[in-house]
Structure formats: C-alpha cells, structure tokens
C-alpha cells in the first residue's frame, strides 16, 4: 500500500483562548501524574495549550479506526514538542513568551495510529480552525530517526511547522505576490501528482501544488525542517523536466523480469535516478515517473551525447529552482517584517537541535553506503550537560522529575 503524508487544513478562525486556566486537580497517585504535571506546567500554564494524549473520540475523525498513543510515546513527543518547537520560537520570536501565547494552537491532540484513507494514503496530522493540531501515528515515533518516511521530520515536525505557519498566515496574510508565482499550475488532484513533477513545476512537494495557501505553508515548513543535503537534492530534482507515463502492456507487467515488477518488488535495487520509479495514483493505478529525455523528433528515440550518454531535459518551460527560491525569499521577508523572526536563523536553530555540530558550529556529516550525505542525530548522542546520558534521556528526565515518591 502506498503511503503519503497528508495534512488536513480548514479555514482558521483564531481565538486567543478557548478554555480557562483553573486548577486541574491532578491525581498524584496516578501512574500518569508525572506527564500530566509536566504538561500542565510547560504547556497549559505557560502557553494556555492543552496537550491531550488520552485520545478523545469526539475530537477525532469518527470514520477512521484509531487507537490512543501509548504513555511512553506520548512522553517522548511531549518533550520533543517543547524542545524542537516551543522553546525555539520562545528564543527567536521578537515577543518571546507573548508570541506563543498569541499564536500557538490551543490544543495538541495525539492519536497512536494514522488515519488510513481509501486511496491508500495515510493522514499523519491535521489542523482544525487554527486552534487545534492533531498529530497521528504517535506509536510509530522513533527518535533514532530524523529523516526518511518514518523519521521525526516527516512524521511530526513538518506538520507542526506547517500548521503553525497557517496560524501566522491567517493572522497576517502572506504577500499577494506569492499567489501569482505559480498561477495556472495549482492542481486539485495533487494526490495523483508525484513529488518530482510538482518540484519540477516549482513546488517543494506535491501537496504544495494544491493551492497557494498550502504552497505557502509547505514552502516555509519544508525550508525549516529539510537539512541542507535534502534541500539541495530537491533543487537538483527541480532542475529537470519530469514526465509521468503508462507502463507497457499487461504481458510485460505480469512478467517477473519486467521493469514494473522490479520497481514494485525490488525498488531499492534499481537506480531510480536514471530509470525512474513507480507511483501509485489515488485510483490505485500505477504510473512510471522519470526524467524527460531528449528525443529525436521523427523516431522518438533518445538522442545521446558525444559520449553515448542519454541527455535529459532541463527546465524546458519553468525555471523551478528560481521559482522555489523566490517563494522562500518572500517567506523570509514576511516573517521578518511581521513577526521579527529570522527564517534562516529559525532553520539553523531547528537543525542544530536535531543534528550534531563541530567546534565551528557546522553540522557534522557522513556518507552512507549509497553515497548519500547524512547527519548525526543529536538526540541519541551524549548530553553536553550530562555526558553519561543521551540528550533524549535528559529531556525525558524533565518529566520524571515530577514523579511523586511513594
């Protein structure tokens, strides 16, 4: 089953407060007291935010089969929300604490499983009326992974920044100049558009191609959370033209040696950079996504260069890299002018909290077996303040400190 990150967004109607700050009367004999007290101090009292980890049926999509988040996974996400989201904006925003009290969502709601959709995708998070963010699939949380489909960025942090951007955008609208950059390219059927084709059209993701509002939120959130290697890889994809084509006839499709079968069964064994990859449409049908190549106008056959190599088309119609950079520039100016937030400093701070840095403050990189640049996860490394434990252990102990001796 194909999976994809879906972020549901509805029209925002921001309210400064939707519940009071009266004493909650926590049960000190409860097994969950430590987490409950931590959430009360660090979210409810600090920012008027209810952090709900005990799944509430009425607060979820009743058409989906969902289970609650586990206590341990809820603890992990709670400290990560504070460390990777709230503490950063508190440090960088011009109004410090006041900024978050004004613009933070009023409810953060967790579910253990994602929302499984009929088209084969999974909903990992969504926002409701600008006051509530639901983070799903919490039981998959693995703080050992930052990048990748099941990494913290894709599963959680991207959603947080995406929805928070919507709240800021609804308070002070993003510039109209942004809306006309990709006029005519927005696509209501974005879920059937591969990321490569969307990126080649000047969008950071296929979801960004849904409309200018999602384009704005996706541009900001991806710029913040993507590390430099992944951002550069996306821009490289943007430098090419891409095409989506049908597989060949059913006879080839059914063959165990066909490209179709190889792509579905052994996708990691083939160089998708040169031959492309399969993509599942919302209808369940598979298409082939590949770079567009230079072809003979008469025969349709590939035209090779003097070294006998296939030639690829580069931005025949759209300078996608320039388009993406233009969108980021507008976001950079808007955040600085309206919220006194330096987008590049925000990105740098987020990534320095995610990854290890050297003595000069540069992110430490390494290369995996496939030649891909990777970064060292700071959460799993020794805490500089207490080298005998990892940073994640130290964060979790801030919850344990609330435990009552019995």
For each feature predicted by the language model, list its residue ranges.
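Active-site recognition of the HExxH zinc-binding catalytic motif
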Residues: 135, 147-175, 217
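Second-shell loop/turn segments in exported
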Residues: 63-71, 143-151, 155, 202-210, ...
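C-terminal motif of bacterial Sec signal peptides marking the signal peptidase cleavage site
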Residues: 4-8
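Acidic/polar, low-complexity intrinsically disordered N-terminal segments immediately downstream
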Residues: 10-94, 98, 283, 314-317, ...
